[in-house]
Design a protein with these regions (language model features):
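Bacterial Sec-dependent N-terminal signal peptides
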Residues: 1-21
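Solvent-exposed loop/turn segments at secondary-structure junctions
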Residues: 42-45, 62, 69-72, 97-102, ...
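Short catalytic-loop micro-motif centered on adjacent basic/acidic residues
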Residues: 63-67, 90-94, 151-152, 217
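Conserved beta-strand hairpin/beta-sheet module of binuclear metal-dependent hydrolase folds
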Residues: 30-77, 165-178
């Protein structure tokens, strides 16, 4: 009886810990295979607004793409990943210079996680006195972590001058970050650093390079509809007319 009671308490404790990853502050959703989407929230125009990131579980640790927008969720995300997969995050890539992508770079660097941005993102963050990555991606690069290969790609300006996408060839997952607008979006969102004239060209280059993705992940809102690239072009057409 004592052993059974201890087991039950341990189970409930573990369930409680992982339950924190779906309490409204941090949501983790399985995408496919070893891919997971994490979503956190911040107030945008007076309303809680979701920001998406991705992590990939490999034999050599977990790769994180972008960091939580909500700064209180930097550690809970690491804890949830460790609890669910019994693996540590070994790498974090931020896809552009805004805080919903780079906010956790310093925190994760202090945790011994290798942090990366492009040279362009690094220089923008440096000029603004914001979080900096430890490692710089000088050009489009293919990484290998564990059994997975993935590619960073800069197609041009759009939501920001430095926005990149990340392509996971084996599973045909295209992580677009804020360069790609969700089908749920009614407008282009934050345009403070945007280049709306170049943005359509950038999207079309991505469509030409990565054909027929199985999954397309935008930086905000719903990510379950693969027509978000076309939707982004439609929003840009409406904005630019």
């Amino acid at each position: 009886m004592k052993i059974a009671t201890i087991f039950l308490l341990e189970f409930l404790f573990s369930f409680s810990l992982f339950g924190q990853s779906n309490n409204g502050l941090l949501q983790i959703t399985h995408l496919t295979g070893d891919f997971y989407i994490f979503t956190t929230y911040k107030n945008y125009q007076g309303t809680p607004f979701p920001a998406n990131g991705l992590y990939l579980v490999t034999d050599d640790g977990v790769v994180m793409i972008d960091s939580p927008w909500d700064t209180t969720q930097f550690q809970p995300l690491l804890d949830s990943i460790k609890l669910k997969h019994n693996k540590d995050v070994v790498m974090c890539i931020a896809t552009h210079s805004h805080e919903d992508r780079t906010g956790g770079l310093n925190y994760y660097r202090q945790k011994g996680i290798k942090t990366y941005t492009t040279e362009q993102t690094y220089q923008i963050c440096k000029a603004k006195g914001e979080n900096l990555a430890e490692y710089i991606i000088q050009k489009d690069t293919t990484f290998k972590v564990g059994q997975y290969f993935f590619e960073t790609y800069y197609a041009g300006a759009g939501h920001s001058p430095d926005n990149i996408v990340i392509w996971f060839e084996k599973n045909k997952v295209l992580y677009g970050g804020c360069l790609i607008k969700s089908v749920e979006a009614n407008d282009l969102g934050n345009l403070s650093d945007a280049n709306t004239k170049e943005w359509p060209k950038t999207i079309k280059k991505i469509q030409g390079k990565f054909e027929a993705p199985n999954y397309v992940i935008p930086g905000h809102q719903n990510w379950t509809d693969n027509s978000s690239l076309d939707h982004t072009l439609q929003l840009l057409k409406q904005h630019n007319k």
